[in-house]
């Protein structure tokens, strides 16, 4: 069932891409006559110690995913990053699983970033300002995951002019509004999408209906010349129904997030940021059956709630020394499964008990810069309470780099991370449901990693980045009986993990040609119950390439050919 749905959606979304782009895969954009572009910036910006940012301005040259500028799909093309199984919208980094990557959307944790069963993500290309993946050194300001940090931020609205855009496709509709609240003082941004392939799905004999919709909003206002307040919201929902002779099955999931941020500049040497947030994920499954006087209706929900806060200070103590310090707090509630049913008029209500996880952390990072040298030395101290036990973790982190100039550099880093959350997958009526639970038996997951890499400018327009890493993990839970696990009756064992690999990325940029190619070799193993075996998502060799070329370039018009190979 799941495979049929995935194949059908894939064909539909490919059709959407063909409908929304010209037949020759050429994209068009207007250029101002008086502007001369000497060279494009690369699509991927490789920073030190495994941190890579996507150049949002250059994303317009990239091929569309199902007619969408999906930033998350490009993150999956980075060296050392995998989407997992076909169609997944996860980020599996350096031998880790999807739950080991912390995904922040304007500093709000996201538990399910998928639209259309993983073919697209919740991050609209019309609203994203920046996107970055940290695989090596991760600032002590962030924790609670073993493998990586992904930060995606939405842009502000235009503070000068009101703007509108509308995109109408064969299967989708999208619109964006932004502009000033008060000129030069504040702005608003509203963007919405609606995907409706029902007309095409109706061709199939099994009467499947599917769609998703989402809306993103952001308000920003300068309450003082040194203090800026912003409010961000997101809400999205996927829904599918399958009708048969006497039965109707429905599935769906949705995210809701909200954040309030205050950014302050106290003086030339001290800045602060305070964020309060709420995030909510719901998975649901609904069935209804009627035949010969018998009726059965049931609805099962799986929910995750989290609210929290983060306070960060950046302080410059001298020309060579600066500090980043602060605190975080979060309260998470997990409702693994709750079922309501009505069988011939009889009401039933059952489910697993809710679980709580309360956590807090203090962090400090020292940053030293002199000449071409840069060093970061920091520590994160965290506490996790699951209502039965409290566990503590101390996570030292450090990196050292040297910049030779002209885009040549080397770096070395070492990190220790801990994790108190467990994610596993279970199928209900052939549909996958992700469960999140806190740690069990007083054991946190732990990992340490060392990375060594460098970047060299081989030619005026050619840059090569290479990085190797080695990682160890322990207390990794392997769940073999989900019912016993959710009931607190065992159903799992602990294991260890090991991963090492080499990542390389080659970038070539000229005025008309942009080429980015990446290769990853990785070996990831797990060991549990005395048996060592390859990690489920281990891909020893992975190659991706993206190229775009301005086929025709003349004043007032430009034709760009783009191609992606994986």
Model-derived features: positions:
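Periplasmic N-terminal accessory/gating domains of Gram-negative outer-membrane beta-barrel systems
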Residues: 48-96, 107-138, 155
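Transmembrane beta-barrel wall of Gram-negative outer-membrane proteins
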Residues: 171-196, 205-239, 250-278, 317-323, ...
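Surface-exposed extracellular loop regions of Gram-negative outer-membrane beta-barrel proteins
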Residues: 185-192, 196, 239, 272-296, 338-342, 354-388, ...
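Gram-negative outer-membrane beta-barrel transporters
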Residues: 470-472, 492-566
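Outer membrane beta-barrel strand-and-loop segments of large Gram-negative receptors
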Residues: 306-312, 351-363, 439, 443, ...
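Short, acidic, small-residue-rich periplasmic hinge/interaction motif at the N-terminus
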Residues: 20-61, 98, 265
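Short strand-turn segments of transmembrane beta-barrel domains in outer membranes
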Residues: 118-121, 129-140, 148-179, 187-210, ...
């Amino acid at each position: 069932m799941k495979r049929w749905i995935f194949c059908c959606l894939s064909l539909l979304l490919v059709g959407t891409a063909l409908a929304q782009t010209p037949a020759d895969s050429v994209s068009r954009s207007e250029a101002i006559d008086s502007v001369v572009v000497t060279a494009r910036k690369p699509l991927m910006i490789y920073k030190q110690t495994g941190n890579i940012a996507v150049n949002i301005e250059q994303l317009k040259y990239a091929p569309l995913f199902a007619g969408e500028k999906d930033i998350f799909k490009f993150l999956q093309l980075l060296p050392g990053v995998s989407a997992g199984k076909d169609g997944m919208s996860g980020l599996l980094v350096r031998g880790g699983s999807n739950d080991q990557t912390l995904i922040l959307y304007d500093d709000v944790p996201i538990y399910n970033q998928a639209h259309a069963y993983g073919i697209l993500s919740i991050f609209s290309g019309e609203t994203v300002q920046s996107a970055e993946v940290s695989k090596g050194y991760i600032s002590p300001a962030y924790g609670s995951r073993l493998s990586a940090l992904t930060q995606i931020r939405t842009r502000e609205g235009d503070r000068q002019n009101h703007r509108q855009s509308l995109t109408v496709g064969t299967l989708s509709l999208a619109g964006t509004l932004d502009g000033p609240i008060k000129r030069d003082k504040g702005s608003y941004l509203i963007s919405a999408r609606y995907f409706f392939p029902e007309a095409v799905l109706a061709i199939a004999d099994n009467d499947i209906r599917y769609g998703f919709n989402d809306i993103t909003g952001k308000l920003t206002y300068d309450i003082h010349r040194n203090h800026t307040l912003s409010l961000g919201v997101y809400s999205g929902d996927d829904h599918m129904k399958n009708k048969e002779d006497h039965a109707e099955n429905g599935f769906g999931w949705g995210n809701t997030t909200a954040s309030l941020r205050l950014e302050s500049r106290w003086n030339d040497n001290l800045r602060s940021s305070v964020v309060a947030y709420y995030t909510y994920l719901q998975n649901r499954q609904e069935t209804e059956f009627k035949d010969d006087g018998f009726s059965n209706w049931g609805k099962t929900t799986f929910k995750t709630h989290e609210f929290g806060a983060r306070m960060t200070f950046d302080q410059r103590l001298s020309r060579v020394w600066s500090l980043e310090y602060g605190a975080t707090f979060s309260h998470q509630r997990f409702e693994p499964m709750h079922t309501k049913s009505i069988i011939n008029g009889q009401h039933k209500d059952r489910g697993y008990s809710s679980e709580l996880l309360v956590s807090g952390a203090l962090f400090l990072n020292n940053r030293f810069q002199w000449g071409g040298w840069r060093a970061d030395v920091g520590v994160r101290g965290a506490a996790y309470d699951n209502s039965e036990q409290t566990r503590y973790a101390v996570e030292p982190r450090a990196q050292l780099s040297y910049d030779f100039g002209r885009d040549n550099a080397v770096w070395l880093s070492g990190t220790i991370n801990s994790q108190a959350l467990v994610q596993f997958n279970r199928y209900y009526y052939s549909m996958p449901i992700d469960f999140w639970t806190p740690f069990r038996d007083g054991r946190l997951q732990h990992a340490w990693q060392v990375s060594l890499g460098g970047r060299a400018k081989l030619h005026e327009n050619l840059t090569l980045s290479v990085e190797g890493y080695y990682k160890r993990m322990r207390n990794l839970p392997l769940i073999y009986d989900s019912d016993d696990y959710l009931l607190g009756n065992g159903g799992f064992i602990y294991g260890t993990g090991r991963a090492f690999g080499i990542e390389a990325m080659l970038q070539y940029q000229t005025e008309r040609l942009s080429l980015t190619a990446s290769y990853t070799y990785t070996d990831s193993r797990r060991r549990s119950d005395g048996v060592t075996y390859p990690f489920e998502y281990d891909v020893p060799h992975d190659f991706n390439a993206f190229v775009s070329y301005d086929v025709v370039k003349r004043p007032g018009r430009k034709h760009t050919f783009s191609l992606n190979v994986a």
